[in-house]
Amino acid sequence: MSRRSRSRSRSPKRDREERKRREDRDRDRERKRDRKDRERKRRHRSSSSEGSQAEPHQLGSIFREERRRRERNESPKLPPPPPPPPSDPPVDTSIPFDVSTLNEPTKKWLEEKIVEQVSARVHQLEAMMAEKATSARNEMEKMLRAQIEAEMAVELAECKKRDEESRKKCKQLEAELERKVLEAEESRKKFEEDRLAMLEQKSQLERDRAELARQKSDMKKNEQQAILNKSGNSRAPIKFKFGK
C-alpha cells in the first residue's frame, strides 16, 4: 500500500520533467528557425545590394512566367526548360536566384526581358522628367511674366508721373516767359517814348537856340543902326584894346 502511494506521488514530477523537456525542445527549434530566418534575410540583403543584378523574387517570377509561356506556346525554336521534379520544395522568393542554372535560350530571353523592362522604366522616367521640366518651365515663365508686367506697370506709373510733372513745369515756364516778354515789350515801349521825348526836347532846344541867336543878331543890327542914325555919319569902327 505504501509502495503504490509512492509511485503515485512520483507521477506528477515525471510529468513536469517531460513537459520541461518538450518546452526545451520547442525553444531549441524556435532558436534554429530564428537563426535560419536571420541567415536568409542576411543573404537576401547582400544579394539585393548588388547593382548589376535584378531582384531575386522578380527574376524568379520572370522565370516562372517564361516557363508558363513556353509551355502554352510550345515553340519549336526555344524548347521549354524541363519541369522540376515533384519532390522539389516550393520556390522561396527570399532566397537569391542563381542565373547560372538556366540554359542559354532562357538566359537570352531573361536578358531581353530585363533590358525591355529597364528601357520601359527609363522611358517612363524620361517622360516624367520631361513633364516636370515642362511644368516647371511653364511655372517659371508665368512667374517671370507676372514679375515683368508688375515692373512695367510700376515703370509706366513713374513715366506718367514724370510726364505730368514735366507738363506742369513747361506750363510754368511758358507763363514766366510770356510775363517776361510782356515786361520787355513794355520796357521797349517806354524806352521808345522816352527817346522820342528826348528827341523832341532836343529839337525844341535847337529851335530855341536858333531863335535866340537870331534875336541876338537882330538886336545887334538894331543897335548899330541906332548908332549910325545918331551920328549921321559913319565913323570908324571902334577898336578895343586889351592889356596895357
From Swiss-Prot:
Compositional bias annotation for Basic residues: 1-11, 32-46
Skewed-composition ranges (Pro residues): 77-89
InterPro entries the record matches: ARGLU1 (IPR033371)
GO cellular-component term (any): mitochondrion
Sequence ranges of Basic and acidic residues compositional bias: 12-31, 63-75, 213-223
A Pfam family the protein falls into: ARGLU
Residue stretches of biased makeup (Polar residues): 224-234
Segments of this protein annotated with the region Disordered: 1-104, 213-244
Listed PANTHER family: ARGININE AND GLUTAMATE-RICH PROTEIN 1
Record protein name field: Uncharacterized protein F44E2.3
Protein's organism: Caenorhabditis elegans
